């Protein structure tokens, strides 16, 4: 591992130098007493922008060893950091923000507001104001674009990339990220509504990015997503293989290489080759540190959902939950990832029509959520922060209770929906899209109760941005439309779900159902 860290340091510094010469753009000021730490931090930022973020954990360790008071560096999280350590770093940076440049100070404030106070709206305003004062720094606009993403505003996000490209038409990070507004990436990346996506434009952005950095595997990797968006799985496979060739031989731990194997697994999944997909998914896991595995581990298990083999899914998720709980990782990491596995176990019980199993799983989840809250109690979180975290945990549990009650036909759905609504309303000051969940489950409940018009009314309240890629609720929306006589629109949605080539839990649960509806 030490050798890998040294190689990462050497290779990344060389790439950083080449990038700066190519871009010749103004970089934000950084405050440190170490020239070497400054050089490495510039490298970290370039890596994050240019699909080399895997190199950053050892660099960030070295930066804080060289200068323990490099406060801006403390805003960067890392696989090597425990959650409590990162919170401590960020609190320390916030307390000392007056000791750095104004630009660093405001980015520290914004990061603190989003991560510690869970207030993305305020973080977004801080960065917007900073751009007004310092419009020449593209890196501030990249921070802003990330916040617009978290606020689920693809238009404002796209505008930030357009502004960067107006200043520098050859900005790799802006071209690379702007393309991703036009196709699915993962659940954390917001996209344009389907009707406004332009895969040809996305392709042009990626090809230009590739011409700027021809050895960067990122553009080819995401061209694979473009082809999947066109349902051209053979071309997607070729693009992913091209990206793999650009990467060369993988390191022992190599999440970029792992991600390419994951993409190739997706190609096999949507070709109906589930055994081959599971082989590729399992191979991709071999290139990950254990802390990285739980999220990716879901994908091979989701293939059982397509086969309606929920018992096998429960066995697999239970196995990973045990491995997580028996690992040597920190307690909070174990709790968060046990929640992830247990939620999948719960969903498997739901769709296996096992109410007793779902109830038992829900009790487990409630216990894990209590442990999660307790971990914040001991980390120095303020009362306001604890109340927000508790409310979010209550929302998660209430959503699952409601989901269960809808599927098993409980009589108290209105009461359960009102409870969810009350919890979500508390978040409106921090999340303008907070009520989306309420309308989705209200639509679902109305459909199950035979009130198709109410279902359509609630689902229509949800923006296309948040509805289009939600295959699960789109399926029930399509059913409501069909039952109300709008067969044309229903068929369009069903066809989109049936032909989907992007792997999510919701898609895995309903795709085969949608195919049978056509």
Feature names for model-found ranges:
Residues 33-62, 66, 105-119, 125, ...:
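Alpha-helical segment of the N-proximal tetratricopeptide repeat
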Residues 41, 72-78, 105-109, 139-143, ...:
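Alpha-solenoid helical repeat scaffolds
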Residues 50-51, 77, 84, 116-117, ...:
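Structural motif corresponding to the intra-repeat A-B loop/turn of tetratricopeptide repeats
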Residues 53-54, 87, 119-120, 154, ...:
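TPR-repeat structural position
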Residues 56, 86, 123, 157, ...:
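Single-residue signature of alpha-solenoid repeat helices
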Residues 61-66, 94-100, 128-135, 164-169, ...:
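Solenoid-like repeat scaffolds
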Residues 111-113, 145, 180-184, 406-409, ...:
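Alpha-helical adaptor scaffolds
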């Amino acid at each position: 591992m030490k050798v890998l860290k040294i190689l990462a340091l050497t290779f990344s510094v060389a790439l950083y130098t080449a990038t700066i010469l190519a871009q010749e753009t103004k970089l934000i000021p950084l405050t440190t007493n170490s020239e070497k730490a400054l050089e490495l931090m510039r490298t970290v930022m370039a890596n994050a922008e240019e699909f080399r973020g895997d190199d950053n954990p050892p660099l960030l360790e070295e930066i804080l060893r060289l200068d323990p008071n490099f406060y801006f560096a403390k805003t960067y999280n890392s696989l090597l950091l425990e959650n409590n350590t990162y919170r401590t770093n960020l609190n320390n940076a916030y307390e000392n923000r007056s000791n750095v440049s104004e630009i660093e100070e405001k980015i520290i404030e914004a990061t603190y507001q989003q991560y510690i106070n869970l207030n993305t709206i305020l973080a977004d305003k801080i960065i917007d104001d900073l751009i007004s004062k310092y419009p020449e720094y593209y890196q501030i606009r990249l921070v802003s674009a990330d916040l617009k993403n978290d606020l689920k505003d693809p238009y404002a996000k796209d505008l930030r990339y357009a502004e960067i490209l107006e200043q520098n038409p050859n900005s790799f990070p802006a071209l690379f990220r702007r393309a991703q507004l036009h196709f699915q990436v993962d659940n954390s990346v917001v996209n344009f509504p389907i009707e406004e996506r332009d895969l040809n434009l996305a392709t042009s952005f990626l090809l230009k990015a590739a011409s700027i950095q021809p050895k960067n595997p990122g553009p080819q990797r995401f061209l694979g997503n473009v082809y999947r968006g066109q349902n051209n799985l053979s071309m997607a496979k070729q693009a992913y293989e091209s990206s793999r060739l650009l990467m060369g031989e993988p390191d022992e731990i190599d999440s970029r290489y792992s991600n390419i194997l994951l993409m190739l697994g997706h190609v096999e999944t949507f070709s109906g080759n589930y055994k081959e997909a599971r082989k590729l998914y399992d191979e991709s896991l071999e290139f990950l540190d254990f802390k990285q595995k739980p999220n990716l581990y879901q994908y091979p298990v989701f293939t059982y959902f397509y086969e309606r083999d929920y018992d096998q899914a429960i066995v697999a998720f239970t196995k990973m939950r045990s491995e997580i709980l028996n690992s040597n990782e920190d307690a909070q990491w174990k709790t968060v990832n046990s929640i992830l596995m247990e939620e999948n176990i719960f969903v498997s019980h739901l769709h296996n029509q096992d109410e007793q199993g779902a109830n038992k799983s829900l009790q487990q989840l409630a216990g894990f959520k209590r442990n999660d809250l307790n971990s914040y109690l001991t980390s120095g979180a303020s009362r306001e922060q604890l109340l927000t975290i508790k409310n979010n945990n209550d929302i998660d549990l209430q959503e699952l209770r409601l989901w269960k009650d809808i599927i098993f036909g409980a009589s108290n759905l209105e009461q359960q929906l009102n409870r969810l609504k009350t919890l979500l309303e508390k978040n409106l000051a921090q999340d303008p899209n907070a009520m989306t969940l309420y309308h989705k489950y209200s639509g679902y409940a109305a459909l199950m109760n035979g009130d198709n018009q109410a279902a359509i009314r609630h689902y229509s309240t949800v923006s296309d941005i948040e509805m289009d890629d939600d295959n699960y609720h789109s399926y029930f929306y399509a059913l409501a439309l069909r039952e109300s006589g709008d067969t044309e629109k229903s068929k369009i949605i069903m066809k989109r779900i049936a032909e989907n080539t992007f792997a999510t839990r919701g898609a895995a649960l309903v795709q085969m159902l949608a195919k049978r509806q056509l």
